[in-house]
Amino acid sequence: MKKYRILVAALVAFTAIAAQAQCPFHNDAFKSGEFLTYNLYYNWQFVWVKAGNASMSTVQSRYNGHPAYRASLTTRGNDRVDQMFVLRDTLLCYSSLDMEPLYFRKGAREGKRYGVDEVFYSYHDGKVKLRQHQLTSSGEHLWAHRTVSHCVYDMLNIFLRARSFNPEGWKSGHEIDFPIADGKNISPARLRYSGKVKIKADNGVKYRCLKLSYLEKEDGKYKRIVDFYVSDDKNHIPVRLDMFLKFGAAKAFLVSMKGLRNPVTSVVR
C-alpha cells in the first residue's frame, strides 16, 4: 500500500485540511488536459536499475451526472524488473469541481498478487459518509461504512487538492497531520517540510523545489515513507520522489509535462 502513496503523497497538503466536513476548496494549480510522465528506478542489490515508467492525466468529466475532474495514475514495470517483481498499478479518482473527493479506486498487482481498493464518498448534514470496499489478494470482498465529521481523503484526491495550497511562510520542520482512506481503513498520515533544494529531472532541466516527507503512523510512531520534491511554482509538480519500500528503495524522476495551467517559474537557469 505504501508505495502507491508516493506519487500522491508527493503532493500532500500545504495547509491544515481536516478541521471539519466543509470540504470544498479552490483549484488554481491544474486544468483539464494535464499530462505528466516519469521514469522509475529500483535499487536492486545496491545497483540502481531502470524499473519502468509512470504517467498521470487529469481531465474534466462527469460523475453520477455532475461535472467532475477525473484523474488517473498508471505505473508499469519493464521486462527486466518483471523478472524480479511484477509491477502493474492503476489509480483512479473523481473529484468535484470544488475539489471534494467523490470516488477512488486502486488496482495493484505486486508479483502474483492482485488487489483492489475503492472508496465512495457522499456528503450529508455536515458529515462525510464513506463506503469502503477491498478485494484482497485471496479473492475476499471486504466492505466498511463510516460516517465522520471531518474531511477525509484518499491518496489521489489529496494530490489534486493539495496542489493549490500555499506554502509561503513555512519553516523547515513544519508538520501537518491529515487522514487518508483506503478500501478498509482511515489512517493518520503526516507531511514534514524541509526547505528548498534544486533538483535535476530526467528531461535535463533543473528545478527549484520544495522538499517534503510523507510519514505514516505505525505502532504508535510515524515512519517516513517517501521524500519528495515539488516544483516551487503555482503548479506544484512532483519533480523527484525517493521511496523507502519494504522490498528495497525506488526513485521517480519527471520526464515530461504538458497541459499545465500556470507558467513553470521554478526552472533554474
Task: Indicate where each model-derived feature is located.
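Bacterial N-terminal signal peptides
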Residues: 8-16
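Low-complexity, intrinsically disordered regions enriched in charged/polar residues
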Residues: 11, 149-153, 248-251
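Sec/Tat signal peptide C-region and signal peptidase I cleavage site
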Residues: 17-21
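Bacterial N-terminal signal peptides that target proteins for export
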Residues: 1-8
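Acidic, serine/threonine-rich low-complexity disordered tracts
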Residues: 22-123, 165-269
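Active-site/ligand-binding surface loops and adjacent short beta/alpha elements
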Residues: 124-180
